[in-house]
């Protein structure tokens, strides 16, 4: 089972396409949608929804996959549920870069402060990151340097921020899920 978490643009048609591509790894791909506008509510909703979905699966190794803001959540919700995560062009600092886009971006800082201290150290090797070299939204070199001590980093020379084509990375994602 793969949980797919969309980015800030929840209605993008690319979400369906990415889910279809992920079905080459596992036919059971589930969209876990969230508002993107209310971080504290989103966290509660995502924790509840993932726990509910996991009760109805016998997959020994479910995987979280998120793009952009979805990768922010995939890392945290995956950690809290003991799941591996794939973080694609993750938005690591929504409290800074979501100003003016959502009602309460400061809630992300509050979530970070209340999260398990040093959670990345406790989550080492349980996530892999895929970064676009040409991401038009974030400085992925900086973000990769924040995560490289904890997770493997793969680079893509072609895809933009929304990462519409996962095909080149599906074998690595599958191997990571099954390892």
UniProtKB/Swiss-Prot annotation:
Gene3D superfamilies: alpha/beta hydrolase. HAMAP family: UPF0227. Belongs to the UPF0227 family. This is UPF0227 protein Sbal_2415.
